[in-house]
Amino acid sequence: MKYTLLFCVVFATVSFGFADNERCNKTVNLTRLFSKFDIQPPSQVVLAGLLPNQTAQWKCTTETNKRDEGVGVKGVFLSYVSSGRGFTIGVSQYNFDPSTYQLYLHRDTNGNSNAFAYLRICKWPSKKWLQSTSNMDTSGRFCLVNKKIPAAFTDHANMVVGITWDQDRVTFYTDKVYHFYVPNNRWSRVVSWCSAADSCAMQYINSTIYYNLNVTTPGPGGITYSVCTKHCTGLADNVFSTDQGGHIPPIFPYNNWFLLTNTSTLVQGVTRVFQPFLVNCLVALPKLQGLTTTLSFDSPLNVPGFSCNGANGSSSAEAFRFNVNDTKLFVGAGAVTLNTVDGVNVSIVCSNNATQPTRSNNLQEDLPYYCFTNTSSGTNHTVKFLSVFPPIIREFVITKYGNVYVNGYIYLRTRPLTAVHLNASSHSQDVAGFWTIAATNFTDVLVEVNNTGIQRLLYCDTPENSVKCSQLSFELEDGFYSMTADNVYAVTKPHTFVTLPTFNDHGFVNVTVGGNFDSSYPPKFTANGTLVNNGTVVCVTSNQFTLRHDFMVGYSADMRKGIFEYSSTCPFNRETINNYLTFGRICFSTSPADGACELKYYVWNTIGAVSHLAGTLYVQHTKGDIITGTPKPLQGLNDISELHLDTCTTYTIYGFRGDGVIRLTNQTFLSGVYYTSESGQLLAFKNVTTGQIYSVTPCQLVQQVAFVEDRIVGVISSANNTGFFNSTRTFPGFYYHSNDTTNCTSPRLVYSNIGVCTSGAIGLLSPKAAQPQVQPMFQGNISIPTNFTMSVRTEYIQLFNKPVSVDCAMYVCNGNDRCKQLLSQYTSACKNIESALQLSARLESMEVNSMLTVSDEALKLATISQFPGGGYNFTNILPANPGARSVIEDILFDKVVTSGLGTVDEDYKRCSNGLSIADLACAQHYNGIMVLPGVADWEKVHMYSASLVGGMTLGGITSAAALPFSYAVQARLNYVALQTDVLQRNQQMLANSFNSAISNITLAFESVNNAIYQTSAGLNTVAEALSKVQDVVNGQGNALSQLTVQLQNNFQAISNSIGDIYSRLDQITADAQVDRLITGRLAALNAFVAQSLTKYAEVQASRTLAKQKVNECVKSQSPRYGFCGDEGEHIFSLTQAAPQGLMFLHTVLVPNGFINVTAVTGLCVDETIAMTLRQSGFVLFVQNGNYLVSPRKMFEPRRPEVADFVQVKTCTISYVNITNNQLPDIIPDYVDVNKTIDEILANLPNNTVPDLPLDVFNQTFLNLTGEIADLEARSESLKNTSEELRQLIQNINNTLVDLQWLNRVETFIKWPWYVWLAIVIALILVVSLLVFCCISTGCCGCCGCCGSCFSGCCRGTKLQHYEPIEKVHVQ
């Protein structure tokens, strides 16, 4: 009754009557839809989701030419009443995206008995008008689903089906609820058509709706519902109905449920964990009412007044999960008290005061919560600081093992618990709030986490789910998957144990610990000392011993007895020492000894909740197998070995553990008991009693499951024993277990020649022989280029890697000496790793050096400043400006340039020959009109002036002398008039043909358009090449970074620091932990080496390709289409150095126009004569009924000739089938890539992973992302520009202006006579002065001679004075 009252308070708006919705004059009942959620009765829950809204209208459009459309929606539901009519639904993005998936669903009008529908989830290249379909053909590509599915509806059965989506998750509501994932769908638009309202009324869903459900019995008849209007969000997010088996329903959003952790918290990812997610009982409680009760771990959950929501488990709980919406609910004074198995109570007390915990319920939310533990036994209390709790608490988890988690993180570890006492008062301000208690057990689950919150959860408790968990995937595609040992279908291997037979003597080591509690309060403890076999020191002399304890403690009357604890600094404790641990020597002492570890014994004070040291046992021990600790005496001769021969077994042989097949051999060895390889692997062992040698061959029991349509239909195993399937069939190399014994003919799974059907049947598939097509000749449609554009394509090819060397020992051990000793046991592991990298680097360096050479002469030729161009210099023989006059012309003549009519001026010059007198006689006629050139020099001007003056001198007598002047003037005026006429006609032609004057501009625009288009394509190739360069430069850095990151992994050791491990543990335990690190780091290192070797192989192949491209593209012209530049006919190529490779610039002719023709391989004449083209590179095709021949590279059709053909034997085309093994015989250099990789991997060393400080690695990354994005943006902009130019070209009319040109006439005008007279006078004066100077100066001049004569007469014959000349030597 209280349970009903609870939900009357929380679900204040629940009305438990059937709620029908008006739908096209019909009512819609949603109980059948809600029954698909399998909510276990009795339950009262709030169901939230993208569901039909009972208050919204349904779309009932049935017109043939109309479609209903919804935008911004997240789902569509269909209501069916009767008549079995058809419908069509299409779902896509609002802005159609052909690169993503769309959904199409169509149901024909085909009744209800065997009705079906077509469901497709594909990528359609363009928008489609929503219409029906009648077959499986579709224009969609890359379909995830293209099926013909059952679609039978039942009349008048309240059937509502639908599809909803949220991000990538798509949900189908049909016979049950199905979930699957369509990546990046971004659906938001629905288009639908319905042929009849009774069959397919539609409702589009765009928001979450909440319904109150009251489930009393299974099925639709036991469900009542109504729309929830109050506190709905919280109820739907936190309360669920537990499914059968304790599973949380998949629709639960896991709000306020966290992944428990004792260390770090997972932020994002998928992980497999063992945590308390199996729910025995879920109880929802209102905060208004509060709760005070005790929850026991030894019995099923029982909350007085409340019952479980959904399925109710009968087992006891391992953990209680408290899902709270109020932080104060669990941090208040005495809200949570833990009852331990030894009777101690531990309560959690929180306060806003860090120094003094107070029992107060008035905590301030804006201040930190300082929490303490109050440990009490009787009236004694011990308060210790616990931690600072988070300001917001959403989940509180308490396990029976004494762990307390807050929001998923562990805050308290205490002793195992028997119960939890709650005292949750109704102090919250949110009186309408609620919280839940879930009694849970630990189970194996797969969890997806995002932002530390649980997104999805999968229970690994079924064979199918176990496979999914092993693959860390919530959905698996059909295929074959490995089966783990925890799968119920897995076959376990027998265990082999071999040890030496021993004759044992046994002894007991008795440890006595004593002490007394007095009667004071709290009681005080006094230790009486510790004895070993009633003494102080015992060394074991037998080869077996058992350690026993006797606690002799005196207790007061109010204390419990026999509560002891212990701690150990030894690699064992008081219990595990008897579990067949072996020693070389071991001694026990009650006083400290050199090299001894300690076992300390404590007695617990149940009144004061304080532990007291009762005694200490010191243990000295050495490694060996002489002495064994046993739980009981095993005296006498004992051989407990157990052998399983000739089968794959898990063995423990003389301490070696592994999996192998043990076989008896005929070999004998005198020495040794077991025999190993150089690497330490067990090869054989000896039976010391009989001397027989047994070999050990490693084995692995391989088992795979055939997974079809989310279920296991069969198991492939190497073992012939299984109890889960009805049939076992034997095949070469394996056994197949299934429930279907028929032979599979239409397989769903195919691997090699094995096929598995949906039912689990298996069959061997025979290869199908290809039937040769017998026909006269083959023909088909091909495209031949008709036009080309020149383009530059950029290509990058890597030539070498950066060499990497790894110090294996330093990487694995980080300089730790003890770790290096352990590493030496791995024999050649480090040697193989280091040598593999070094040999690969040296081999690559040698190949690169032999490939690349440097030519000094070529470098000089490439530099313009150093190019030896010779000593040619033509500046002295060429004019300064083209077309200039000579110097004499510049001095003697003035040049006048005018326009002339046709050939008038040239004819006039030839006639007059430069004589002015012949001016009028050489007059020319143009179009019947006499004309003279318009320019007259001075001679002509004076001549016609004299003629005019002469005609005027004597009046009428001499008037005829003026006629030449008149004729000349009229002729020259005619010349000017005709020039004007030509100019006018040119102006008229310009005006008439302006609209077609842009033809050259159009051609220019077309050229610019093509250039921009090719530039855009070129920029794309540059961006791709730069992207490859960036990947090459950064690829190795990423690998090294990943290798360094592995150093953070502890590989299941307690720490990733070797020094830290040895500082915290004893040597034996630390060696085991460090061995895990060594194994893991070697695995990481081997993975890096394998990746590096693979990269070396890839670069070697690219280096070979680069050499081919240099020879074929750079040094010659490639005949191969697309080999140099991806597409087009190759012209020439250039190469440029790039980081770790070469950048090729290929100039190619790219086809930009094609013509489609029907090509034929040859001609068959009367079925007797077969003819085909003789020359390669040509194609024979049919066009308009005519046979033509054209080069394949360029469409140049012509009629075929006899010389073009060669006759072949027959018209029949023959096919030759060969096997893969025969291919190398036909093609010797053929390489089977898969086989080569298998051989490489088989020869690689057994490799592993590393651990180093992250600051050791420093790698600079080349980031060209911005440049590449910029190039791509520019390319896109150029492409858009070319489209704009194309539009402009279409808008320009073709125009052509053909002007009538006037000749350009050059006339040289002679200077007048007085100019020449002045020139002559000037020359006479200059010559006179020069002559005078010559005869008047010098010793031989006239003046000089006369002066000498006159001087001799006056002075007589006395010679003139002169100075003597001295000889001067010049050195």
From Swiss-Prot:
TM region positions: 1313-1332
Ranges for region Fusion peptide: 949-969
Main location: virion
Virion surface side stretches: 24-1312
Organism name: Bat coronavirus 512/2005 (BtCoV)
Domain notes: The KxHxx motif seems to function as an ER retrieval signal.
Intravirion topological intervals: 1333-1371
Cellular localisation: Virion membrane; Host endoplasmic reticulum-Golgi intermediate compartment membrane
Classification via HAMAP family: ALPHA_CORONA_SPIKE
Cited Pfam families: CoV_S1, CoV_S1_C, CoV_S2, CoV_S2_C
Residue ranges, annotated region (Heptad repeat 2 (HR2)): 1228-1324
S1: annotated segments: 24-737
Name listed for the protein in its UniProt record: Spike glycoprotein
